[in-house]
């Protein structure tokens, strides 16, 4: 799973519109003032955490037919050099292409190009609370280094479980994690 992050940017656009008359003809004059302020991010992402790969290894289809989903695979987002005078909270969310049959979960792409596999990938907190795509989880930051643990899991689509038609083979998916500081 490829996970990336973007930068924080605040853009303020102020537009002043005025009319001026010259020789009896009205002209529209528009002055646009742009102020761009790049904010200091309170934390840096630990080197190597910009791209997180998760390998599920071999998943036996019979396991999914019995349990509907796999046990969560842990991964961490490590933030370093946090300055809580800038912000003491972070909201973490995940985005990607959603599986239409498993709301809030990522769709997967079969490596063989066989079409729909019948599974999705979900995110959850370390304690097992489901995190739908685009939903933010709020966390308090500590001065210095912070580590946030999450799980991803593979879940079968209900109709594929009933029909026992999960396609076998390798698959991939990607998501982006977002950090929003308060």
Question: What name fits each language-model region?
Answer:
Residues 2-10:
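Sec-dependent signal peptide recognition
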Residues 11-19:
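Hydrophobic h-region of N-terminal signal peptides that target proteins for export
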Residues 2-3, 19-182:
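Mature extracellular/passenger domains of Gram-negative fimbrial/pilin and adhesin proteins
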């Amino acid at each position: 799973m490829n996970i990336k992050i973007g930068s924080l940017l605040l853009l303020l656009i102020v537009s002043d519109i005025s009319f001026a008359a010259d020789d009896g003809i009205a002209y529209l004059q528009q002055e646009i003032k742009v102020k761009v302020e790049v904010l200091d991010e309170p934390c840096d992402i630990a080197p190597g955490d910009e791209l997180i790969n998760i390998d599920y290894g071999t998943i036996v289809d019979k396991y999914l037919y019995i349990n509907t989903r796999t046990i969560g695979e842990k991964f961490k987002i490590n933030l370093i050099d946090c300055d809580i005078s800038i912000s003491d909270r972070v909201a973490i969310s995940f985005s990607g292409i959603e599986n239409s049959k498993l709301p809030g979960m990522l769709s997967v792409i079969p490596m063989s190009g066989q079409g729909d596999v019948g599974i999705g990938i979900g995110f959850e907190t370390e304690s097992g609370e489901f995190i739908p795509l685009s939903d933010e989880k709020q966390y308090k930051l500590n001065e210095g280094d912070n580590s946030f643990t999450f799980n991803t899991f593979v879940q079968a689509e209900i109709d594929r479980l009933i029909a026992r038609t999960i396609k076998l083979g390798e698959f991939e998916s990607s998501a982006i994690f977002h950090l929003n500081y308060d």
